[in-house]
Amino acid sequence: MDKNRRRGIERLCDEQIVPGTEVILLDDAFQHRYVKPGINILLVDYHRLICDDKLLPAGRLREPKEGKDRANIVIVTKCPEDIKPMGFRVISKALKLYPYQKLFFSTLKYSRLIPLFEEGEYPLDELLPHKHVLLLTGIASPEQMKMDLEHYETDITPLSFGDHHYFSAKDVA
């Protein structure tokens, strides 16, 4: 893409890079005011709700909490699978959303494991205890994924890169 989101979108449209494109979905574009979105979707971590967070550098917020009012949709991510209806209501009340804002909840569901040095795939629940796993991530908060894998008593070597890291061969060599 382009660090200048507006220019990147204009280039996509002008050059017809993907003919027939009707939707452009941007990650981490909530605070980019030069782009006029058709819909704003805000992702909020279940373990660190926006109402409990602080602005950088004390917290993870890039703008004041009130910025959430621009969101059309709020998705609370990384919810436990066994969350009760009361938990949904408590979070809904804490977020103080407006009637025009839709609230959704999501949970993590991992795909199948793909071994590096052999063919095939297998489900996470078939991960053998004491099997060595290289956990390569390029996401903002890999801690939950690491904790989920530790549940399987697996030997984990984390190799974590920042969110949106541009991987090179040197990174994984």
What function would you assign to each model-found segment?
Residues 22-24, 42-44, 103, 154-161:
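Short hydrophobic/aromatic-enriched beta-strand-loop microsegments
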Residues 47, 73-86, 106-112, 136-141, ...:
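G-domain G4 guanine-recognition motif of GTPases
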Residues 4-11, 120-123, 171-172:
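A short, well-structured juxtamembrane/interface segment
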Residues 1, 49-56, 111-116, 161-165:
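Short, flexible loop segments at the rims of nucleotide/cofactor-binding pockets, characterized by
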Residues 118, 128-169:
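Redox- and metal-dependent alpha/beta enzyme cores, enriched for Fe-S-associated oxidoreductases
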Residues 94-96, 101-109, 158-162:
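Beta-strand->loop->alpha-helix junctions that form or flank phosphate-binding loops
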Residues 12, 36, 53, 86-87, ...:
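Short, well-ordered secondary-structure micro-motifs
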Residues 1-99:
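Phosphate/Mg2+-binding loops and adjacent switch elements
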